[in-house]
Amino acid sequence: MKRVLIIHGPNVNLTGKREKEVYGDINYEEINNLIKREAAKLDIAVKIQQSNSEGEIINLIHSAENNFDAIIINPAAYTHYSLAIMDAIAAVSVPVIEVHISNIFGREDYRKTSVTASKCKGVITGFGPYSYVLALNAVKLLEDSIGG
């Protein structure tokens, strides 16, 4: 069974309460339940973490080495400027998939840049909470394609 670390960045814990026109009505607990259901279907074990702190997110990324087979991360606002998170992603050997609930390329100009994406295996953006579902399926497809 593959093990995947899910990292929710700042303010993701407020999903369903803030900016519903951008992030939708689904709340944080419902997103996590959706992730757990899809992971079970795919025979993937998930550990779900959320942090509003850049340093804690970096520590979570570092902890994935030798403990997880992949990381799915929503860096949230850190996407646009955190070179430290980008460097942490580059420092681990496990594949990292970046996800976003909203389509960052359809939003404000300052949100159209992802400094973290360049070190990720891929990016899934704009599919609401299903961005996480698609990312879990991508992990499974990667596993199947490399025989691991």
From Swiss-Prot:
PANTHER family: CATABOLIC 3-DEHYDROQUINASE (PTHR21272:SF3). The record marks 18 as: Transition state stabilizer. This is 3-dehydroquinate dehydratase. Keywords: Amino-acid biosynthesis, Aromatic amino acid biosynthesis, Lyase. Its EC number is 4.2.1.10. GO terms for biological process: amino acid biosynthetic process; aromatic amino acid family biosynthetic process; chorismate biosynthetic process; quinate catabolic process. Catalyzes a trans-dehydration via an enolate intermediate. Substrate binds at residues 74, 80, 87, 101-102, 111. HAMAP family: AroQ. It comes from Thermoanaerobacter pseudethanolicus (strain ATCC 33223 / 39E) (Clostridium thermohydrosulfuricum).
